[in-house]
Design a protein with these regions (language model features):
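Elongated, amphipathic alpha-helical interaction scaffolds
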Residues: 1-213
Length: 213
């Protein structure tokens, strides 16, 4: 019998990354993912449901949506089942988070950056997604220079993560991906001595404790 929950399942993913009580998990994961580029000390969780701008517009429901202490917007999604246009879906979600920043009346169009992080428990057929990690940003075609930091999408294809043992994991980001892929198979939570956040994860993800709640 499994000891821990499976982070790739919707409710478990939200329990780990989308709760005020467990936001340390989200913060350490994001800091590991973006390293020194995005240093997060705290996050405020926002409403995950965004209605359309007009009555006939389609709304969206994010898995996790938060705003960092520096005002950056972060969306985190887990997609377990293969979806043909998931790359486009992530773009749509990012665009919605940008558009929702618009206000009526006098506005200078200053936008807060939006980061969308997509866990994918499948290998996409999209030609732009060939590696475990793909980062999409706005760049100039000629110079290849980044022209705006207002939008970034990170796709993480879990089946392409090539570190299969604890010893191969070199930093906290590697550890997080290894755990997300394999947590439901663990008897003990790895990396707990090196990174205290994983002791917290072991507590909130223990199925025995959940059954008593």
């Amino acid at each position: 019998m499994a000891r821990f929950i499976d982070p790739r399942v919707d409710w478990a993913f939200k329990r780990i990354f989308g709760s005020e009580d467990t936001k340390e998990c989200l913060i350490t994961f994001l800091n590991g993912l973006f390293e020194d580029e995005l240093v997060i000390k705290d996050v405020t969780f926002a409403k995950t449901e965004k209605l359309g701008l007009r009555p006939d517009d389609r709304g969206v429901v994010f898995d996790v949506y938060c705003i960092t202490n520096k005002g950056k917007h972060v969306i985190v999604e887990m997609q377990k089942k293969e979806q043909e246009y998931f790359a486009d879906r992530a773009l749509y979600y990012t665009a919605r988070a940008i558009v929702q920043q618009g206000i009526r009346g006098i506005w200078d169009y200053h936008l807060a950056p939006v980061y969308t992080v997509c866990f994918m428990d499948f290998v996409s057929q999209s030609p732009i997604l060939k590696e475990f990690r793909t980062d999409l940003v706005l760049t100039d075609l000629q110079t290849r220079q980044r022209v705006s930091d207002r939008m970034r999408i990170v796709y993480l294809q879990l089946p392409l993560f090539d570190k299969h043992t604890e010893a191969e994991c070199m930093d906290i980001f590697d550890c997080w991906i290894y755990i997300v892929k394999n947590m439901n198979m663990f008897e003990q939570m790895p990396f707990s001595e090196k990174y205290p956040v994983f002791r917290k994860l072991a507590e909130i993800g223990d199925l025995r404790k959940l059954s008593r709640e």
